[in-house]
């Protein structure tokens, strides 16, 4: 960036330096706040003006603007503290450490899962608060742990902490710094894993469990770090980035801790030693933190690089949260004290890892790419909302597609059109390593900043593709653009018109409109995804050109359910999301025209109706004898229902695509009676792997026949199981997706 376009870094560093000198209760803080606030306001105006004047430089300036906003936030917090009626620090009584730790104790554990090592030099009140947070926040149901407190030659009341029950207290004669303190604590540690935690931190309820589970469940991970937040709630670090020049960035510093980009699991360059967990054998192999970086700084970065050199991953876990004062023990001035080693050790680190930095790290202006250490290609998926796989089969398919992309080496960003964070579904994706966008985020702005970085964009459903395709074609210049139909809407509407005669004219008009829309979109993208071979054949017969791939629903056989045979099952079950109109029509047709005949033949058999979004009027219609109306159920409850039922019905009279509900029934060893619409695209054959009937009378006869014929029942489910494995596995979908992306 030329001088003409630049904003002086000196302005920001002056503001930051002044801010670092502020302390709560400082009698002169008001004057300092005024000066600092003035500097920041001036800087903020400069940055905003440069963004307006030079939009191409926006991505380089946004980070500085966020820092300014964060600094302003800290000023407000400090201002509130300095205007309180509390006495100045000098007049306050010294904290009573004995009172602070009253009632604090830790369990006695012979072979702990985790050793938590806390180095401390003076600031006994910090250490006491840290230990109290561990004692009060952590659940006894989590991993077992021991606490190793390293007194690094303290001269205050830190020694009083030694009285805490079952605390392992290591006392050094002198201050060995963070490196020496941690290493002396590690000698005493007995845990399978080791956590290093700063004494000026306080933990949260999920802090330990999420750190432990992340590393314990994935052998490819060597080190995991926490999300670090300032006491006022502002983000301090969401993983760290190291640039080619060895400068580091605490990603997200001074931004909002709940912003979407800081809340998904991802590989990072390093995690701050303020809160990390590492495998014990690795720490032993490395001989602890490297004494090259004695007394402190860059030792945690060096450790992360060594972990990665061993072929293991360094991962950021946002659900593990600590509140950290930062500099509470070491201070913040890089010209004096231990803090000066931040500059000295950077040079040592740069010299040791120069080749790695040059070959594998990005320049500072490319921090968007540098925030994710995986180096994977970037895929953007745009869909109406976050998938809810326990409510509809389309969501199951979407989650499976995301997993397939990840297995093919893509890092996935998921953009829900409604930009709504939906728990627990958003959280589940984030824990899979998916960046889920939510909040007041503008797609045009996002695309201008980052569109060039993406290799793939998948737009799901015609309405979504129509809304986003122009921006994507303009700004995602390096990406393959893919339209995922989910199903052919125009086909479904045409079939609905055949059933709903009263609305036929309107439905046919809608069908024609969707046909023009869908086929038009197919001509504007690089490839189209459909869910069945029948849809490929239809489109090709209608003259649609271009790449068309089949990525159907994904299913996995539940072998345990197949151990429950004919004699141990009873009742009939229907599953569907009733926001989908074909499902409403299906259950109404079944109740009015089919079930009465079934009930005559099988009076003791119940119909179990399962599914979300059941309208009140339909629910009233279903409140009849022999009908068990369950509505929405959890995955566990649904598994129990499907494992205990004898016959699954799918009386669909219109629709398109493939039917996830049928595939799910087969997963659980449940033979199916359906229509030709229901079996379409499912690779099922009448009398071989299912029973088909399109007339009400025939449908009822098929149910009663299958319900009573054990031999037929066993044959259908055996053949359906083989067909499902051949056509709907995750490996089949992944191969199809891989071929699509290579073409």
Per-segment meaning from a language model:
Residues 390, 394-399, 403-404, 414, ...:
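Conserved catalytic-core segment of nucleotide-activated headgroup transferases in glycan assembly
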Residues 171-189, 199:
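Glycine-rich, basic loop-to-helix element that forms the pyrophosphate-binding segment
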Residues 201-243:
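Conserved donor NDP-sugar-binding/catalytic core segment of glycosyltransferases
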Residues 5-112, 332-395, 401, 427-432:
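Non-catalytic membrane-proximal stalk/linker segments that position and tether the catalytic domains
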Residues 661-665, 671-675:
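Short hydrophobic beta-strand element within catalytic cores of glycosyltransferases
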Residues 243-269, 284:
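Short, flexible, basic/aromatic active-site loop/helix in glycosyltransferases
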Residues 192, 454-455, 526, 643-657, ...:
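Acidic donor-binding loop of glycosyltransferase active sites
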Residues 133, 149-160, 174:
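A conserved acidic beta->alpha catalytic loop
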